[in-house]
Amino acid sequence: MGQSVVVLGAQWGDEGKGKIVDLLTEEIGAVVRFQGGHNAGHTLVINGKKTVLHLIPSGILRNGVLCLIGNGVVISPAALRKEIEELEDTGLEIRSRLKISPAAPLIMEYHIALDQAREKAAGGRAIGTTGRGIGPAYEDKVGRRGIRVADLHYPDQLAEKLRDALDYHNFVLTRYFGVDGMDFQRIYDEMLVFAEYVEPMKSDVAGILHDLRKQGKRVLFEGAQGTLLDIDHGTYPYVTSSSTTVGGALSGAGVGVQDIDYVLGIAKAYATRVGGGPFPTELDDEIGQGIRDRGVEYGASTGRPRRCGWMDIVALKRAVAINGITGLCITKLDVLDGMDKLKICIAYEYHDKRSEYAPLDAQGWEECTPVYLEFPGWNESTHGITSWEKLPPAARAYLCALEELAGCPIGIVSTGPDREHTIMLHDPFA
């Protein structure tokens, strides 16, 4: 039987999953995206060249690797086509290696309009979405109004479903938000064009995954966003609209729990968050700005500055428990170079009580005060180091503390953006 590894974010997203997925795809059968949409931004740096992927799995830069988009992903036709064409312009063969589940829902133009209208109307209470229609597309999926890739094969039924969806969404857009509605014929014609484009890539992703496992091939499941943004387990309502946990990998790709051999949780050596929502260890000072500048902490999808703070072990332990994380990968260690001292949040003060567990609601998180352990920093550069022994003693001590406090072994340490800037302590496929 083959080996399957799930790579997912153990914080609020932007942990560096794309680089690690690319790193682990050297000898692999397939990479599958199982949730989210083009709100993800996975940045890869190979031989100094930067590539940002939003929808296509990060394994696409490896020749011969099959890339799958599962039923749990919501697909923007325009974004998919743009990303394919940009990659093909670099000389890569894309469409023959990209397979898309017919059950994947489509992000329609009215989803984007609704997303943006809501954020504008919310004003200061806005969640901070990317405004790309992700949430409304998932709403239609649950409300059984969604249009899926499979529907494109049946023009008459597509027209009927599109009319029904537009009746609903145009009513909301015009009557509730006071913005223009959408034209049926234009959207329908665009969908017919996209139907021809996507048809050769349409395939039974779940079936492919089962066959690969029987053939003894390695499969990597690539998560987007992070555990603390999960629709069920995150800081609701400041969350994404999909399941970002290992449970989402199972349902979003169509495999069983027995098909997963290893869960790799990715976490930065500090913490970041984009948009609104609680963030107990946030550093709204020159220390936080310094981390942002050194770490180039600006969203790959939106360009928005990320909020930066100290490592939060309470939150990390929650992610480890929810996902059954087998091993951790700590990224961006080099961003902490040159800092006199570092802090790790080990507990919260909440209503005059100390707790090592995270509250179950966003308001509770907002009312938490972090309890810190302090560690000495290091002046030496860790950038590009590939050996544990060559790390400064203080950096090793910091990582060992993270490992012990989180109750989960560290298998990989990333010391820079390039594929080679990595310390591999334990290969998840070994």
Curated annotation (Swiss-Prot):
Instruction: Give the superkingdom in one word.
Output: Bacteria
User: What Enzyme Commission number(s) appear in the record?
Assistant: 6.3.4.4
Cofactor(s) listed in the protein's UniProt record: Mg(2+)
Pathway the protein acts in: Purine metabolism; AMP biosynthesis via de novo pathway; AMP from IMP: step 1/2
The entry's IMP-binding residues are 14-17, 39-42, 130, 144, 225, 240, 304
One GO cellular component term of this record is:
cytoplasm
Q: Where does Mg(2+) bind?
A: 14, 41
Q: Which Gene Ontology BP annotations are present? A: 'de novo' AMP biosynthetic process; IMP metabolic process
Give the record's keywords alphabetically. Answer: Cytoplasm, GTP-binding, Ligase, Magnesium, Metal-binding, Nucleotide-binding, Purine biosynthesis
For the ligand (substrate), the binding residues are 300-306
Q: Which CDD domains match?
A: AdSS
Per the entry, the cofactor note is:
Binds 1 Mg(2+) ion per subunit.
Which terms does the record give in the GO molecular function aspect? Answer: adenylosuccinate synthase activity; GTP binding; magnesium ion binding
Residues engaged in binding GTP: 13-19, 41-43, 306, 332-334, 414-416
Compartments annotated for it: namely:
Cytoplasm
Gene3D superfamilies given in the database record: Adenylosuccinate Synthetase, subunit A, domain 1 (3.40.440.10), Adenylosuccinate Synthetase, subunit A, domain 2 (1.10.300.10), Adenylosuccinate Synthetase, subunit A, domain 3 (3.90.170.10)
Record carries keyword Signal: no
Record: active site: 14 (proton acceptor), 42 (proton donor)
In its keyword annotation, does this UniProt entry include Disulfide bond? no
**Subunit composition?**
Homodimer.
UniProt function note? Plays an important role in the de novo pathway of purine nucleotide biosynthesis. Catalyzes the first committed step in the biosynthesis of AMP from IMP.
NCBIfam families linked:
PRK01117.1, purA
The UniProt entry's sequence similarity note says: Belongs to the adenylosuccinate synthetase family.
Full protein name: Adenylosuccinate synthetase
